[in-house]
């Protein structure tokens, strides 16, 4: 029988909250030697993901030309409100200010093939695994899938 996401995921992963200090989240990433964290609300429901890509905002010097390239994306300054939001994200000091909102997630009953296809399609390296109430119960990474394939 084919393995499911629940068979391979890391259960009870480290998580952070939107109000967690960014410095604290970075320390947690380093201690756990991981590249991303699910962000949950007080009820444990998934509200975002913090990744190394999100943290790259912190390393960017912001000099507002008519447009600028930020994390390989061209951001045009035709809309000053959007620029202000992007600048604020770049300089944010809490997880909530830097995280990727509207995260892509998966439930444990999906197949590994479905998880791999979703990661590839959405260009993500990890998927928070949620239950029917959208509470984080695990995390699955590309590495988890590759290691499972190698052991079969």
Regions inferred by a protein language model and the residue ranges of each:
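A periodicity- and composition-biased signal for non-globular, repetitive helical segments
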Residues: 131-132, 148
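A short, polar/charged loop-to-alpha-helix boundary motif
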Residues: 56-71, 145-152
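Bateman/CBS regulatory modules and CBS-like beta-alpha motifs in cytosolic regions of diverse proteins
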Residues: 1-28, 34, 39-42, 46-47, ...
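Short hydrophobic beta-strand motif reused across regulatory alpha/beta modules
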Residues: 48-51, 56, 138-145
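Gly/Ser-rich helix-loop-strand patches that form or flank binding pockets
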Residues: 122-126, 141-152
């Amino acid at each position: 029988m084919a393995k499911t996401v629940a068979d391979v995921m890391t259960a009870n992963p480290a998580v952070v909250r939107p109000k967690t200090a960014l410095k604290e989240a970075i320390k947690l990433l380093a201690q756990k030697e991981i590249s991303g964290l699910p962000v949950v609300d007080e009820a444990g429901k998934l509200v975002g993901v913090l990744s190394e890509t999100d943290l790259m905002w912190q390393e960017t010097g912001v000099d507002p030309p008519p447009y600028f390239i930020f994390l390989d994306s061209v951001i045009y300054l035709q809309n000053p409100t959007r620029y202000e939001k992007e600048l604020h994200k770049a300089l944010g000091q809490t997880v909530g200010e830097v995280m990727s909102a509207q995260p892509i997630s998966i439930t444990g009953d999906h197949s590994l093939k479905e998880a791999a296809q979703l990661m590839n399609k959405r260009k993500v390296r990890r998927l928070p695994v949620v239950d029917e109430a959208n509470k984080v119960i695990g995390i699955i990474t590309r590495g988890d899938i590759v290691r499972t394939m190698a052991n079969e």
